From Swiss-Prot:
Native source species: Homo sapiens
Residues that hold a 1,2-diacyl-sn-glycero-3-phospho-(1D-myo-inositol-3,4,5-trisphosphate) according to the record: K273, L274, G275, G276, G277, R278, V279, K280, T281, R285, Y296, R306, N355
Location of region: C-terminal autoinhibitory region: 392-400
Protein name, per record: Cytohesin-3
GO cellular component, one term: nucleoplasm
Tissue: Almost absent from liver, thymus and peripheral blood lymphocytes.
Record's keyword terms, sorted: Cell junction, Cell membrane, Coiled coil, Cytoplasm, Guanine-nucleotide releasing factor, Lipid-binding, Membrane, Tight junction
Free-text comment about domains: Binds via its PH domain to the inositol head group of phosphatidylinositol 3,4,5-trisphosphate.
Length: 400
């Protein structure tokens, strides 16, 4: 074979001219270069794809880590709201503005609604700004007052402290009036009527309230609250019927089905109660203090109380007992030796009058005894909710 017949890509036909041979060899050389380039590009693409896979893994890892931190932040919030918010801000999971914190609470995913309520009710300047931003996330336009309250009271659980409730309901009333101009003469009117509706809900759907308020009584109770004038009777009747037909749905965080009867208790917890029968035995009961009554249950999940002690006309005192520590008593200071007006449920379901001259109760610790005595004294002496309403009604009356 001719020496020119060798080279890249095999032999060259002998019948080609020198010029054609050179052109063919040039084509073969460029083909090889292209094949080499393609192989190099394949290698580079493979490297890039590997880098992309690594980056994706890193991003997924970051997302997983972020989700874990958010979940941790929610848990911290449910245990201590201020520390939970601080943790989320420090880890760049939440901006430090009141608006961002309000949005986080409003979404509420994985958050305890009782804790949300306590946090929003705090009087720190930042918390007040968060409350304002939180309320502004609610759209109440074209809703009647009951519809707006349903939406508002589902987004958190009202705290038990009167001052906290006052701030939150004041913010609600201002927002409702802003969204619905002309419905009420003032935010005070909206505030007073909102409380009247909440109390109506409790009265209508509390199994222990025998004398259920009628629409006429509800209308009469709210006369003169609109800057001295009356609200339209049709409006009040519609609000009454709405609550009568469907009670408020209150968020339940503890699994107990007590929300209709025991709306925002002043205090609740386990205590020991000395029996009133011939054989005096101590029994552990779950106590709930609300609406100037002390209710006790056998279990936290019971729907009906085992006993009800109205606190009207009673007093409370600390006592020593040789068998149990941290004791206090409820007694009637005006009629010593007289059986206290109360009722209890027997094992067969019958409701009978109590037979206690005094109710002796033992708390788990000295601190809890002091807290219970303080709460019961406050409940006996005055109801802060009625104080707040009385203040608003006086303010309305003074505007006449």
């Amino acid at each position: 074979m001719d020496e020119d017949g060798g080279g890249e890509g095999g032999g060259v036909p002998e019948d080609l001219s020198l010029e054609e041979r050179e052109e063919l060899l040039d084509i073969r050389r460029r083909k090889k270069e292209l094949i080499d380039d393609i192989e190099r590009l394949k290698y580079e693409i493979a490297e890039v794809m590997t880098e992309i896979d690594n980056l994706t893994s890193v991003e997924e890892s970051k997302t997983t880590q972020r989700n874990k931190q958010i979940a941790m932040g929610r848990k911290k919030f449910n245990m201590d709201p201020k520390k939970g918010i601080q943790f989320l801000i420090e880890n760049d999971l939440l901006q430090s503005s009141p608006e961002d914190v309000a949005q986080f609470l409003y979404k509420g995913e994985g958050l305890n609604k009782t804790v949300i309520g306590d946090y929003l009710g705090e009087r720190d300047e930042f918390n007040i700004k968060v409350l304002q931003a939180f309320v502004e996330l609610h759209e109440f336009a074209d809703l009647n007052l009951v519809q707006a309250l349903r939406q508002f009271l589902w987004s958190f659980r009202l705290p038990g402290e009167a001052q906290k409730i006052d701030r939150m309901m004041e913010a609600f009333a201002s927002r409702y009036c802003l969204c619905n101009p002309g419905v009420f003469q003032s935010t005070d009117t909206c505030y007073v009527l909102s409380f009247a509706i909440i109390m109506l809900n409790t009265s209508l759907h509390n199994h222990n309230v025998r004398d259920k308020p009628t629409a006429e009584r509800f209308i009469a109770m709210n006369r003169g609250i609109n800057e001295g004038g009356d609200l339209p009777e049709e409006l009040l009747r519609n609000l009454y019927e709405s609550i009568k037909n469907e009670p408020f749905k209150i968020p339940e965080d503890d699994g107990n089905d007590l929300t209709h009867t025991f709306f925002n208790p002043d205090r609740e917890g386990w205590l020991l109660k000395l029996g009133g029968g011939r054989v005096k035995t101590w029994k552990r009961r779950w106590f709930i203090l609300t609406d100037n009554c002390l209710y006790y249950f056998e279990y936290t999940t019971d729907k009906e109380p085992r006993g009800i002690i109205p606190l009207e006309n009673l007093s409370i005192r600390e006592v020593e007992d040789p068998r149990k520590p941290n004791c206090f008593e409820l007694y009637n200071p005006s009629h010593k030796g007289q059986v206290i007006k109360a009722c209890k449920t027997e094992a067969d379901g019958r409701v009978v009058e109590g037979n206690h001259v005094v109710y002796r109760i033992s708390a788990p610790s000295p601190e809890e005894k002091e807290e219970w005595m303080k709460s019961i004294k406050a409940s006996i002496s005055r109801d802060p909710f009625y104080d707040m309403l009385a203040t608003r009604k006086r303010r309305i009356a003074n505007k006449k």
